[in-house]
Curated annotation (Swiss-Prot):
Annotated stretches, region: Enoyl-CoA hydratase: 1-190
Compartment(s): Cytoplasm
Protein name as annotated: Fatty acid oxidation complex subunit alpha
Disulfide bond residue pairs: none
Subunit note: Heterotetramer of two alpha chains (FadJ) and two beta chains (FadI).
Matches recorded under SUPFAM superfamilies: 6-phosphogluconate dehydrogenase C-terminal domain-like, ClpP/crotonase, NAD(P)-binding Rossmann-fold domains
Site (Important for catalytic activity): E118, E140
Gene name tied to this protein: fadJ
GO biological process: fatty acid beta-oxidation
EC number: 4.2.1.17, 5.1.2.3, 1.1.1.35
Lineage of source species: Bacteria, Pseudomonadati, Pseudomonadota, Gammaproteobacteria, Enterobacterales
Species per Swiss-Prot/TrEMBL record: Salmonella typhimurium (strain LT2 / SGSC1412 / ATCC 700720)
Length: 715
């Protein structure tokens, strides 16, 4: 059996070798271990051809250079030594590219990430296109790793240590102009002339190393370096709370290379890569990566999707404006907005204008592209322009009769095949569809706020929703750049259902006297991006608590909020950040004054505000209720799999990614430990902590939510 090479060498008449990268049968180029032999064969030919003037590496794919190394390679490593060997092999290959006797140019169009950028860094010069798809970065930290093929050593020497630390510690991706400004690439050109521009660069004599800016040169010296690394360590520890060991190792490895030389740096990089690959944090983060990749490929149902050429939106408020933006500007679909007045339409249009104008100002897109995307959005105060819409999303108030009226109006004014998707966060989809003439075309599509930032959507079919409606709605969500999970039509759906007891318990501890900042800090230390009380302020106390009575009516007392507390807060006109006062006080809009806890909140709820519980106890009380409810959702088939439950929690509410999601975390703790902990908490705090039947059964049978074959890598 003949294997087609992913690297093809062509020597032009002008004696420039062009190496085209095209992984067979894949949409995206990724580096695999078996490619080393192919690359070395090409490098041997290049070294032996004394007439060559230069070499250009370029992708034959339409929209990516190299998107990174194949992460499955790490999953195949049985121990740290094997992972370290993998890194050393990558380092050696990059060193051989760098050692070529003629100028070597990386011609970059599309994603150049991870191992792809490390390969480009091994080239002597880099040139990239000005296309919006072109991004360069080292995102390994997001998988609990560090760049293992020389990236931690070459990048600081090319762009300076502070820029390199920022890129590697955050996984930040630079667009073309940003990369040029940083010194990461030497030129930016239109895609049409990329190859010729790279060839011309390859014909030139090797240029001297780029001179770093004065600031970077100062920071590269012993005194500047010592100060920089001290500050970076402090800032990173505050941000990660010690939950991400990769960040500490990245700092150590870069410092080693600068202080002791490249050889020591490469050695430290390989050892750190091997050790990090075996950490539970990296295994969990890689599992989330594979799970999200699988979800993005999941069509939602076995039926083929229906037509999806244009979309209507009912309501031009915050959610409607955000949905219009992701539909038109991410999905490329024409959008028609209907609102009861022109102010609503103008608000939605301004929402998109502001987001696009920010992109223009940051030079991410051109003004012409902004205008082209805005032209996809139009509006009216009636149903003109709706007759041919394939799908209509309602984003109106949480009022059942109003939403039922919207269904009737859409059925009357739109095509027979038009799907009605409700953005409700709490109302049953079956109730919204109760009077529909075509209930099979009614579905829930729950976005999270702010729509342009939150990656998750819940797709909620009711009992009569057709398979094609599900498939079409999932297809739309993907076009909008979202990660969709299909969940059952039960009160709270999935994300809000597991979030509610978590927030309720935080408020309950507040009534027991725990301080606001202590509760929030405890959950941030556990790994959440913000604490539960701050989250409620950010969402809006009125909005965030509206679902509590719905859940209490459906599931009983375990969802009841502490008596009268929420009412007292709302009656005092405290809505959170949106009106400047909630549990916290906020400075004037536009000012950088920090939020601070409002001392009056304690008097309002009748407590002194003196913390007694440890951070671990606070986190345990909140998180265990969330986990217990997630297990119930699994048992009741609210979610289709543990995979969907983990993705929903991580992408929807910021469950700590380094734990892999609630189900992977419960598997790590073990069902027996889960049950024992919940029983202990139930004895202390009441029956709301009683372990659910699913966990008790699993403890008896020693079962897990994830099977062994699903845990570490893509299937």
């Amino acid at each position: 059996m003949t294997t087609t090479s992913a690297f093809m060498l062509n020597v032009r008449l002008d004696n420039v070798a062009v190496v085209a990268i095209d992984v067979p049968g894949e949409k995206v180029n990724t580096l695999k271990a078996e490619f080393a032999t192919q690359v070395r064969a090409i490098l041997k030919q290049i070294r032996e051809n004394k007439a060559l003037q230069g070499v250009v590496f370029i992708s034959a794919k339409a929209d990516n250079f190299i998107a990174g190394a194949d992460i499955n390679m790490i999953g195949h490593c049985q121990n740290a030594q094997e992972a370290e060997t993998l890194a050393r092999q990558g380092q050696q290959l990059m060193a051989e590219i760098q050692a070529l006797p003629v100028p070597v140019i990386a011609a970059i169009h599309g994603a150049c990430l991870g191992g792809g950028l490390e390969m480009a860094l091994a080239c002597h010069r880099r040139i990239c296109t000005d296309d919006v798809k072109t991004v360069l970065g080292l995102p390994e930290v997001q998988l609990g790793l560090l760049p293992g093929s020389g990236g931690t050593q070459r990048l600081p020497r090319l762009v300076g240590v502070s820029t390199a630390l920022d890129m590697i510690l955050t996984g930040k991706q630079l667009r073309a102009r940003q990369a040029l400004k940083a010194g990461l690439v030497d030129d930016v050109v239109p895609q049409t002339i990329l190859l010729e521009a790279a060839v011309e660069l390859a014909k030139k004599e090797r240029l001297a190393q780029r001179t770093l800016p004065v600031r970077e040169r100062i920071l590269a010296g012993p005194l500047g370096r010592a100060l920089l690394f001290r500050l970076v360590r402090k800032k990173t520890a505050q941000k990660t709370q010690g939950n991400y060991p990769a960040t500490e190792r990245i700092i150590d490895v870069i410092e080693t290379g600068l202080a002791q030389g490249s050889s020591s740096g490469y050695d430290a990089e390989a050892r750190a890569f091997g050790e990090l690959a075996m950490t539970p944090q990296s295994q969990a983060l890689r599992a989330i990566f594979f799970a999200s990749t699988e979800v993005k490929k999941d069509p939602g149902s076995d039926a083929p999707p229906g037509p999806l050429n244009s979309v209507g939106i009912l309501g031009g408020g915050l959610m409607g404006g955000g949905i219009a933006w992701v539909t038109a500007c991410k999905g490329g679909l024409p959008v028609r907005i209907k609102d009861i007045n022109t102010q609503g339409i103008n608000h939605a249009l301004k929402y998109s204008w502001d987001l696009l104008e920010t992109k223009v100002r940051r030079r991410h897109i051109k003004a012409s592209e902004r205008d082209k995307q805005l032209a996809l959005i139009s509006g009216s105060t009636d149903y003109r322009g709706f007759s041919h819409r394939d799908l209509v999303i309602e984003a109106v108030f949480e009022d059942l009769p109003l939403k039922q009226q919207m269904v009737a109006e859409v059925e009357q004014n739109c095509a027979a095949h038009t799907i009605f998707a409700s953005n409700t966060s709490s109302l049953p989809i079956g109730d919204i569809a109760a009077n529909a003439a075509r209930p099979e075309q009614v579905i829930g599509l729950h976005f999270f706020s702010p729509v342009e930032k939150m990656p998750l959507v819940e797709v909620i079919p009711h009992a009569s929703t057709s398979a094609q409606t599900i498939a079409t709605t999932v297809k739309l969500a993907k076009k909008q750049g979202k990660t969709p999970i299909v969940v059952s039509d039960k009160a709270g759906f999935y994300v809000n259902r597991i979030l509610a007891p978590y927030i309720n318990e935080a408020i309950r501890m507040l009534t027991e006297g725990e301080r606001v900042e202590h509760i929030d800090a405890a959950l941030v230390k556990f790994g959440f991006p913000v604490g539960p009380i701050q989250l409620l302020d950010e969402v809006g106390i009125d909005t965030g608590t509206k679902i509590i009575p719905v859940l209490e009516a459906a599931y009983g007392e375990r969802f009841s909020a502490p008596a009268n507390v929420v009412a007292s807060i709302l009656n005092d006109d405290r809505k959170g950040r949106k009106n400047g006062r909630g549990f916290y006080l906020y400075g004037e809009k536009g000012r950088k004054s920090k939020k601070q806890v409002d001392p009056a909140i304690y008097k309002l709820i009748g407590v002194q505000g003196q913390s007694r519980l440890s951070a671990q106890q606070v986190a345990e009380r909140c998180v265990m209720l969330m986990l217990n409810e997630a297990a119930r959702c699994f048992d009741e088939k609210v979610i289709r799999s543990a995979r969907d439950g983990d993705i929903g929690a991580v992408f929807g509410i910021g469950f700590p990614p380094f734990l892999g999601g609630p189900f992977r975390y419960m598997d790590a703790l073990g069902p027996g430990e889960m049950v024992a902990t919940l029983q202990r908490l139930a004895a202390l705090y009441g029956p709301r902590y009683a372990p659910c039947e699913q966990l008790v059964r699993m403890a008896e049978r020693r079962e897990h939510f994830w099977t062994n074959g699903e845990t570490d890598q893509g299937n």
